[in-house]
Amino acid sequence: MAGHSKWANIKRQKARVDAKKGKTFTQLSRAIIVAARNGIADPNGNFQLRTAIDKAKAAGIPNENIERAIAKGAGTYQDDESILEEIRYEGYGAGGVAVSIEALTDNRNRTAADLRAAFSKNGGNLGQTGCVSWMFEQKGVVILEGEIKEDKLLEASVEGGAETYEIISEAEYQGAEVLTEVANLENLNQTLQERGLPVKEVELRWIPNNTIEISDPDQGRSLLKLLDTLESLDDVQNVTANFEIAENLTTLISAS
């Protein structure tokens, strides 16, 4: 069951970007609004909402802000954020790398303009709907953080209906990612927690079916800068790209 390295390569390549920034309060609050709107406003009966709240609390968002976001999603508190749309944008980075972007916006024209500018400044271009979506498949991901015993992870993953997992053991990070079908994410998360594994968070993620290895340092820098720029936009919730950086370039790019 152990996963092919492609499952975690995107996570590793983004470590440098993610270390510099976390999700903003705006991004996390919007995730709560949409989750409450798409289901019931009770986190006990809405897994998407419960997950969004957990992430917000981990980021230090005050409870009153969380409650306000839930109310907006439920329709009992009205403002501009109450009319948020979920939109998936697609484009190409340097060298034709496919980029998938999930956004929550109250003004799709503003969001498209911001994304177009981000792509053009970093050697890419915003594409038409459907141009790269076929290159990705949505999966449920349970992220573990800490030292992982593989035999314990394997047993729990099989029991929880996981498709694959990847253990990440590096000097700066110890953990694992466990993938499953979207409909099975809540069950897998519960199983891993019940088996005592260190679950940090869960999420839905678009996983590339295949990846392109980047061996040119300038292209690698351009792509990482593009991801950084896209993820810094408040309207953007998640960004996925179908590339991995050649191992011999990782240190060089990270040091630049």
Regions found by a protein language model. Give the residues of each.
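N-terminal cationic and glycine-rich segments that engage phosphates or anionic surfaces
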Residues: 1-127, 132-141, 185
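Positively charged, low-complexity, intrinsically disordered RNA-binding extensions
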Residues: 143-256
